[in-house]
Amino acid sequence: MCNCKNKLNDFEKYVICEKGTERAFDNEYWNNKTPGIYFCKCCGVPLFSSEHKYDSGTGWPSFYMPVGEILEAPDLKGGMFRVEVMCANCKGHLGHLFGDGPAPTGLRYCINSVSLTFEPKY
């Protein structure tokens, strides 16, 4: 499933390939307010824009909509139902989707920073 294992360090492999989660408030982009685009760390496709990013108070980067194609799959780990989100291009794990986001979508894409790279908009 994980097509980019060779390019990743051990922690990136854990999150992206093994569907792990990084720590809240201890990740690169949770508080990033710089305008720009977030790309898939594995394959480089654009996934999210800072225009759709908001502070959800969770300690992870949160977006109310993607700009790229995202796959969704049920996630029943830990005895609870969640919706996993993955890059549609490479199938790398990004995070989870929740229904408690702001207007206009009511969605919260809760994303691991380690699954992304960021390019500022100048």
Predicted feature locations:
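A short Gly-Trp-Pro
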Residues: 1-122
